[in-house]
Amino acid sequence: MTNPIIAFQNVSKVFEDSGTQVLKDINFELEEGKFYTLLGASGSGKSTILNIIAGLLDATSGDVLLDGKRINDIPINKRDVHTVFQSYALFPHMNVFDNVAFALKLKKVPKKEIEERVKEALKMVQLDGYQKRSIQKLSGGQRQRVAIARAIINQPRVVLLDEPLSALDLKLRTEMQYELRELQKRLGITFVFVTHDQEEALAMSDWIFVMNDGEIVQSGTPVDIYDEPINHFVATFIGESNILPGVMIEDYLVEFNGKRFESVDGGMRPNEPVEVVIRPEDLQITLPEEGKLQVRVETQLFRGVHYEIIAYDNLGNEWMIHSTRKAIEGEIIGLDFTPEDIHIMRLNETEEEFDARIEEYVEMEEPEDGLINAIEEERHEENS
């Protein structure tokens, strides 16, 4: 990693009035120009981290660094960061121009420069021409764009976003995900985004920190975290998962449901108890006699792009399957999957141990070749 723009070194936070510890020895580094997400449920500590970076809260212990310099005692207005709050915190009695220009006016920036910079900021968020519009006459998405324009007009090193999409409807929220991500890429500013929505985190982030009970449970790229969850919490919090108890017989061989299957994981003790994860979309429905497992369909829901089927095997384990075909309740079907579809989780493995094992035993991802090259390669393999 290049020199980090933001770093936390053994940062903890305890609220003195209640004695509640909300952050426990947090360590991380953030590179400049990337989109980071703090992902967790309510009370996990994600917003506390954001507020400590902003200077709205003090760390009880540990160091907070900006460009390698300790900023624990630096006041809010002296930090080169800007926060976009969930409520947007706009001034309702001011129009769009005055809201966006507010910080520049406080700094006594020349009037002509203010006009130029406001126009450029509004153009960035697709609100050019809205300068005189009343805040109260804007939609939720437009208000959010104004808040973002106000955040970027000072060209801060870091923009902090505290669940800014949560108040929007689904369609607008999806549109704003694209806009925020593209804006961050154009500006090259470090974004730190807080959310409880795993789909937002997966869609927008370069790097995700999954939080639970004041700790960072796992960090990595969206693909890393989705494909290789470190433990039961992450596997269930990020997407849907089928999780079963198993035993790692030896490297690349796991036993669950009374059968042994090839896998791509290793680095564990022989006969070590583990948890096995198979995602619903990785299960292929086959004829019963052709499947690696047989299950009986209990119920199903139509989700638009697929049917979500709930089925049970003869040991009573529940299976969720995603299929484009409708099942018949009560019918017995086969389930097929590949070794790459099986993800192994050790019990009580630390992130350091997990990262070391994954690096040694799991195959590295092939470089991205694009869709066309991938299609041509598949056809070549089929014809050879």
UniProtKB/Swiss-Prot annotation:
Compartment annotation: Cell membrane
Topological category with respect to the lipid bilayer: Peripheral membrane protein
SMART domains: AAA
GO MF term set: ABC-type polyamine transporter activity; ATP binding; ATP hydrolysis activity
InterPro entries documented for this protein: AAA+_ATPase (IPR003593), ABC_SmlMolc_Importer (IPR050093), ABC_transporter-like_ATP-bd (IPR003439), ABC_transporter-like_CS (IPR017871), Mo/tungstate-bd_C_term_dom (IPR008995), P-loop_NTPase (IPR027417), Transp-assoc_OB_typ2 (IPR013611)
Domain ABC transporter: 6-238
EC number(s) reported in the record: 7.6.2.11
Enzyme class: translocase
Catalytic activity: ATP + H2O + polyamine-[polyamine-binding protein]Side 1 = ADP + phosphate + polyamineSide 2 + [polyamine-binding protein]Side 1
Keywords: ATP-binding, Cell membrane, Membrane, Nucleotide-binding, Translocase, Transport
Any one GO CC term of the record: ATP-binding cassette (ABC) transporter complex
Residues that coordinate or bind ATP: 40-47
Subunit annotation: The complex is composed of two ATP-binding proteins (PotA), two transmembrane proteins (PotB and PotC) and a solute-binding protein (PotD).
Role according to the record: Part of the ABC transporter complex PotABCD involved in spermidine/putrescine import. Responsible for energy coupling to the transport system.
Family affiliation: Belongs to the ABC transporter superfamily. Spermidine/putrescine importer (TC 3.A.1.11.1) family.
Protein name, entry field: Spermidine/putrescine import ATP-binding protein PotA
Organism: Streptococcus thermophilus (strain ATCC BAA-491 / LMD-9)
